[in-house]
């Protein structure tokens, strides 16, 4: 990975990130964070890997005939026509297990670009490496060790561990502020990979990388699952956004690249993507009717949409008050839906009300007084009914 075809899509994704950021901020991004999952890169033959390389200004060299990647080639600045962007990857545990050669390829690319004798304003990787390695030398590391440590850009879980820790934290309500979410994200994800180093815990270095990010990215190559149907999206990408917000003190620009249609690759902001899925799926009557055909599981999945929306809001501020109001209206207040939920899965209805009330309690949603009162009524009513059922069975 990546294949020549994936390289072309990766270049398009990279160009769109840069163009979008310039249109919003008026300058090039110096540092970009990208989430790399194994399944997506297997399906797309390495599109996200290609984007990582392209942002650095490095292209793969392919073996004639087999098209296997056999090396790397620096794209000259005259050809690139832009600065080399510094890229940090948060890899999944499965990516670590299934793509060790790709991790080493990306690590080599960073080291290659860092060694180039180029103007620092044309090579942000070198700019950051020079500054960070000097700091590490001042802390007592040798020049060689300081350079190596400053150059780590591939981070993930320690060996044998999977996940980002964020979903469990939010589900358990075990947090008070964005700083708590960031702390968990760093603790789980600050294990560096590259060369002979396989999972060295470097929280200070990972925090520095997160605190420098101008942009965060997670790309999608299909619509089978999305950021509201699974909590993994928020755990990895939302967690990264939360880390930047906490450490840097301001939110990054955050994008979702969509390459489901290879002829029309598009780049949405996280907020735009959340609203797109919210309108087209979550509150779409056809979607709700479809879920109602699946009984207990359909009800549980609907509750998950509310939960994942709330979790995204906690990390990335993607929800607006009207969206929470719509969830309350369409999922919990609608007589037909409410009756069905009470029949097939009252626990899901109780969870929906509980999450919506938590969003209000945490200040993520300024609920209308009548909406809040109705949600409290539903929660207590279902709780009473479930207690009666429990008493009958005991």
Can you say where each PLM-predicted feature lies in the sequence?
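Ligand/cofactor-recognition surfaces for anionic moieties
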Residues: 1-394
């Amino acid at each position: 990975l990546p294949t020549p075809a994936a390289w072309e899509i990766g270049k398009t994704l990279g160009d769109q990130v840069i163009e979008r950021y310039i249109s919003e901020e008026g300058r090039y991004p110096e540092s970009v964070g990208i989430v790399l999952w194994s399944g997506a890169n297997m399906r797309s033959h390495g599109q996200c890997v290609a984007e990582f390389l392209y942002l650095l200004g490095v292209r793969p060299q392919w073996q004639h005939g087999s098209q296997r990647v056999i090396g790397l080639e620096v794209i000259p600045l005259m050809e690139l026509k832009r600065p080399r962007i510094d890229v940090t990857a948060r890899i999944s545990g499965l990516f670590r297990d299934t793509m060790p050669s790709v991790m080493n390829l990306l690590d080599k690319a960073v080291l290659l670009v860092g060694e180039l004798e180029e103007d620092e304003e044309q090579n942000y990787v070198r700019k950051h490496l020079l500054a960070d390695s000097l700091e590490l030398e001042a802390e007592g590391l040798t020049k060689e060790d300081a350079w190596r440590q400053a150059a780590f850009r591939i981070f993930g879980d320690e060996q044998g561990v999977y996940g980002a820790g964020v979903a469990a934290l939010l589900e358990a309500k075990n947090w008070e502020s964005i700083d708590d979410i960031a702390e968990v994200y760093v603790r789980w994800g600050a294990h560096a990979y590259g060369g002979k180093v396989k999972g060295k815990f470097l929280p200070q270095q990972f925090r520095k990388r997160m605190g420098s990010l101008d942009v965060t990215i997670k790309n999608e190559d299909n619509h089978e699952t999305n950021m509201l149907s699974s909590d993994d999206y928020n755990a990895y990408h939302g967690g990264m956004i939360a880390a930047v917000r906490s450490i840097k003190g301001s939110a990054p620009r955050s994008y979702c690249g969509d390459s489901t249609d290879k002829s029309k690759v598009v780049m949405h902001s996280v907020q735009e993507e959340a609203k797109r899925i919210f309108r087209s799926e979550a509150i779409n009557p056809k979607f709700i009717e479809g879920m109602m055909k699946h009984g207990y599981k359909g009800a549980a999945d609907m509750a998950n949409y509310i939960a994942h929306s709330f979790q995204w809001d906690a990390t990335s501020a993607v929800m607006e008050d009207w969206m929470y109001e719509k969830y309350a209206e369409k999922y919990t207040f609608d007589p037909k839906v409410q009756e069905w939920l009470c029949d097939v899965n009252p626990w899901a209805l109780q969870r929906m009300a509980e999450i919506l009330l938590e969003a209000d309690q945490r200040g993520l949603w300024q609920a209308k007084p009548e909406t809040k009162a109705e949600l409290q009524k539903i929660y207590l009513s279902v709780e009473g009914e479930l207690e009666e059922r429990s008493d009958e069975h005991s």
